[in-house]
Every structure is written in structure tokens, then in C-alpha cells.
Amino acid sequence: DCLLSRGLGDVYKRQPVYYELETNNGNRDYRIQIGGHYMNYNTVYVGMDVHKESFTLCSCKYEDEKASHYQRTPASYKNVLRYLAFLRTIYGEDTRFVCGYEAGCLGYSLYHQLENFNVECVILAPTTMLEQRSKRRIKTDKRDAEIIARSLAQHNYSPVHIPTETDNQTKEFIRMRDDHKAELKKIKQQILSFCLRQGYQYDGSGNWTAKHVKWLRSLKPAGLYKEILDEYLLTYTILTDKLNRLDQRIEELASKEEYTESVSKLTCFLGIKTHTALSVIVEVGDFQRFVSARKFAGYLGLVPGQHSSGDDRNGLGITKAGNTHVRRLLVESAQSYTRGKIGYKSRVLRSRQAGNSPQVINYADTVSYTHLRAHETRGNL
């Protein structure tokens, strides 16, 4: 009755169906099915607002209006286990517990620690949860934990995909390489700015070519300025050599049995090389969870937003929700279509496509042709 009074039957447009189940110890458990979702009366949902130093925990059942049993503990999975043991003294040993926390600084570590003790755990994607944080005027750890618990209970969230250990290690390695790439970009900017402040300007065709680097090494600014430039160039050389070594290691990782076929297929596309292909594979994981390309684009935050009301239609830029790393790589890859030529494939692209099936190559070429024609008629992508 309490469920019907809350209007859930109207929301799902279906008549609720009740089940009475018998548990292992003879107790009775009740479950309701509405719109394909099974709500277990004997399930307790534990919301965890997790930080580096502390966890804020609370619990609620599906039929509860508010969460209860709030507790703030030091950041440790052992304290979560103690909290669950405390809840069992209240709800009984047969109670099913589902814990959840937002994707954030802890990554997958807390999830795996709890799973090792057979504790059911979910990582929630923040942008898909019941209540948008930006709309709230009061934000506390206690309220955050309650929102997580209620989202778990009412199934108003999307879970984060949990990668395999191999995928996660490969993902972290690639991100580490990209961090060094960002450092190299920064040191390049610092070198150019330093030279400009000292009155040196390169009049060649482009920066960071072999001729440009040779010109930088030939400069002889006065006094301590020479030592400063030498230190900058030393850092540049170290980072360049390290990136070459890391890129070679990524090539080795991509040649593993679990990755080689998928990487080979993805590199058939214009603008996608081994680094981007392997990043997409290990970051996304299971592509089968996306029923369409539109859903995948939404996951990456590449679909346009909208702020409309009544007859007013106001289109926004891309939502930028989801995986920032993959979105940046694919946006960079898309720039290749602004420079490609219709009907022409470079020697490098032909070498990447070599050895793949004709169906894969034809599909990649068709996609490239479509986008190149679109660029030809509409300008920049």
C-alpha cells in the first residue's frame, strides 16, 4: 500500500506484482516487481560518501522515506565492514546489503576491498544519480551519503563499468604516459617564452623541428641566461627520450593477445593510431553496454546539450559528461578529417590497414569518405 500511495504504479504504467519468498532459515521475504525492476523488502542500501580521510555512511530500505543510522568513520574498508556488522544486528543476518559510492578519488580500490569480503558494492556515475548536485543549496557529507543510498534503493543511477585488472593497469600506464606528454608540452612553452623574453625569435618554418632544436642549442645568451636555457633543454631532451620509450612500451602492450585484434581494427580508421586505439579499448571496456552510437557519444559527453522551455529552443555545446580522457583523444583524432583528401590514403594508413579483413577496411574507408565529404561541404568539423 505504501508503494501505491507513492505513485510508483502510475510512474511505471504497470500493475505492481507482489511475491512472497521463503529464505533459507524459514523467514518470509517480500519482493515487488514494478516495470521490470525487483525491489527486495529485505535489502538494505548503504550510501557511502567517501573521501581521502573519512567515510560518511548511512542506510535505507526501498520503502523508507529517509535514510538512517548515519555514521562518520576514518577512511578504511574495515570500518565499512564493522558498520555492516552493526546493521546486521538490527536487520538480521539474512539481510542483503548493497553498498555504493560515487566515482572519484578512490577509484576502484574500495570496490575491490569490499568485494574480497563478498560485500555487494556499486560505483555510481555522478551525472546519472537521482539528484543533481548543482541544484542543491546545502551540501554536506551526510546529505551526499543519503542521496547515494536513495539512488541505490530507487535504481536512479548508472553503474560505473569495472575494468579487469589487466585493463586497469594498461589504462593507468597510458595515462601516466599522457601526463609526461603534458609536461613536455609545458616545458616547450616555457622554452619559447624564455627565448622571446631574451629577444630570440626563430624565423624558420616551424617550431620543434630538428632545425629549430639545433638553433636553440646554438644560442649563447649572456651570463646566467645560458645556464637557464641549458637546463630547460636538458629537461626537454629527458622528456622526449622518455616519451619515445613509453610509446614503444605501449606498442608492446597493444600486441598482447587480448588487445591485438581490436587495436588492429581500430587503427584502420583515419586519425587513430595505436595509442588512441588502446586507450579507447581499456578505458571503455565493454562496448556491448552501449545499444547505439548515440548512447556511446552520450557516455563520452560528445552530444550537444539543450536548455529549452516552451517554444524557446536553446542549443548548448557538448555536455562534456563522462570520460574526459577518451573524449579528448577522439576529438584530436577527428581533426584528421579536416586535413585528409577524398580518395587518397597515406602510406602510413595503408600500412596500418594491412592484414585486416576487407570488410573492416571497407567500413573504415566508408566512414572516412563520409566525414571527408561532410568537411568538404560544411567547412571545419
Give residue ranges: language-model regions.
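Phosphate-backbone recognition surface of nucleic-acid-processing proteins
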Residues: 265-268, 274, 279-368
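Gly/Thr-rich phosphate-binding beta-strand-loop-beta motif of the actin/hexokinase/Hsp70
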Residues: 40-61, 148
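Intrinsically disordered, low-complexity and often Lys/Arg-enriched segments
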Residues: 10-42
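Nucleic-acid-processing active sites and adjacent nucleic-acid-binding tracks
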Residues: 64-94
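Glycine-rich, often acidic, oxyanion-interacting loops/wings at catalytic, nucleic-acid
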Residues: 178-263
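Short alpha-helix plus adjacent loop in nuclease-associated cores
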Residues: 124-159, 312-320
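Single conserved hydrophobic/aromatic residue that forms the stacking wall/gate
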Residues: 1-15, 371-381
